[in-house]
């Protein structure tokens, strides 16, 4: 079977890790990268060395020329276009484009990639109008005529599988989510201007920063049965990677915490294997760096007040786990054509 050919627009945190994921698989192939702000030699350096995930040792990366990188012996075209319409994806053979700039997140803007020859676009961020899919939750609803889709957010990818299990087994009446989230590139290294979010302008490495998130509400888009039943907020904390969701819910069907744990464990070993994890080990955030799964339920960290009110805790590598799901979604879509 021919490999699925993928291009990446935006070689930031997610773009580079999606590239690493693709290069580790044998069912897809990286054929092009576009980033107008990074020179080809700097791309080589940024891909090879990573402060969180370590040096990339699976593929030797070399600079062939100003417009080509070599991953092992595989050439990857490099473009530097600011306007997505101008990126020659078709010329490079890219059927799928991962839109990971964080800029072109609505359908109209992302559609510009189609003019350059791409057939499908997967946005690696939430979108206000593109249909959102979470692998393990609603990817089966994808229809082949959808050319632009969103992989939702890393937090929605963590929360949705857990919420699905709880709602399917016990019914969710209502719930609140808090994500304790690692700092990201949009935050400030020292206090600086942030007119839309004053707290967000404070130094990331020195503060716990309350923040907004649409991740819980977005679950209602991928699981319509939960629409209006969940909302949430975030705390940005001074760690570089791995975040954790606290989901506190009131459930319809009374169940002990042991019964809830058993249900999650069963699903993690069944239909959601590889997506939802389960652990009873005494783990901390760094233990999940590089974890492929979207959501790893921490059985020892949760508590219940009574048989209808429970707090559930689930970890996620907000970089690596999410990037893995981006590629999984691409492969699912490729099989629906």
Swiss-Prot record:
It is an enzyme of class 1 (oxidoreductase). Its EC number is 1.2.1.12. This is Glyceraldehyde-3-phosphate dehydrogenase, cytosolic. The active site is at residue 154. GO terms for cellular component: cytosol. Its main location: cytoplasm. It comes from the Eukaryota. It comes from Mesembryanthemum crystallinum. D-glyceraldehyde 3-phosphate binds at residues 153-155, 184, 213-214, 236. Residues 1-151 are annotated as: Binding to NAD. NCBIfam families: GAPDH-I. Disulfide bonds: none annotated. It is found in: Cytoplasm. Key enzyme in glycolysis that catalyzes the first step of the pathway by converting D-glyceraldehyde 3-phosphate (G3P) into 3-phospho-D-glyceroyl phosphate. Essential for the maintenance of cellular ATP levels and carbohydrate metabolism. The keyword Heme does not apply. InterPro entries: GlycerAld/Erythrose_P_DH, GlycerAld_3-P_DH_AS, GlycerAld_3-P_DH_cat, GlycerAld_3-P_DH_NAD(P)-bd, Glyceraldehyde-3-P_DH_1, NAD(P)-bd_dom_sf. Gene3D superfamilies: Dihydrodipicolinate Reductase, domain 2 (3.30.360.10), NAD(P)-binding Rossmann-like Domain (3.40.50.720). Belongs to the glyceraldehyde-3-phosphate dehydrogenase family. Plants contain two types of GAPDH: cytosolic forms which participate in glycolysis and chloroplast forms which participate in photosynthesis. All the forms are encoded by distinct genes.
């Amino acid at each position: 079977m021919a490999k699925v050919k993928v291009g990446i627009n935006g070689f930031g945190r997610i773009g580079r890790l999606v590239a690493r994921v693709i290069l580790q698989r044998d069912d897809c192939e990286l054929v092009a990268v576009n980033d107008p702000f990074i020179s080809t030699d700097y791309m080589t350096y940024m891909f090879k060395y990573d402060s969180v995930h370590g040096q990339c040792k699976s593929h030797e990366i070399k600079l062939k020329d100003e417009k080509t990188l070599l991953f092992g012996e595989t050439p990857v075209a490099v473009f530097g276009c600011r306007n997505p319409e101008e990126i020659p994806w078709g010329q490079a053979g890219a059927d799928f484009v991962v839109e990971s700039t964080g800029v072109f997140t609505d359908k109209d803007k992302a559609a510009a990639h189609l003019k350059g020859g791409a057939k499908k676009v997967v946005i690696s961020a939430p979108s206000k109008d593109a249909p959102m899919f979470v692998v393990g939750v609603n990817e089966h609803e994808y229809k082949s005529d959808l050319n632009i889709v969103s992989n939702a957010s890393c937090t929605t990818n963590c929360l949705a599988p857990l919420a699905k299990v709880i709602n399917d087994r016990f019914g969710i009446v209502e719930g609140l989510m808090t994500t304790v989230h690692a700092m990201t590139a949009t935050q400030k290294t020292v206090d600086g201007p942030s007119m839309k979010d004053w707290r967000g302008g404070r130094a990331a490495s020195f503060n716990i920063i309350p923040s907004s998130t649409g991740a819980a509400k977005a679950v209602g888009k991928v699981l319509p049965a939960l629409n209006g039943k969940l909302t949430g907020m975030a705390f940005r904390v001074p760690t570089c990677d791995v975040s954790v969701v606290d989901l506190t819910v009131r459930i319809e069907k009374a169940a002990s915490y042991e019964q809830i744990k058993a249900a999650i464990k069963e699903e993690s070993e069944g239909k959601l294997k590889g997506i939802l994890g389960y652990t009873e080990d005494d783990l901390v955030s760094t233990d999940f760096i590089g974890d492929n799964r979207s959501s790893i339920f921490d059985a020892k960290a949760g508590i219940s007040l009574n048989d209808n009110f429970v707090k559930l805790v689930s970890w996620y590598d907000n970089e690596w786990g999410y990037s893995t799901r981006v590629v999984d979604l691409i492969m699912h879509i490729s099989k629906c054509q």
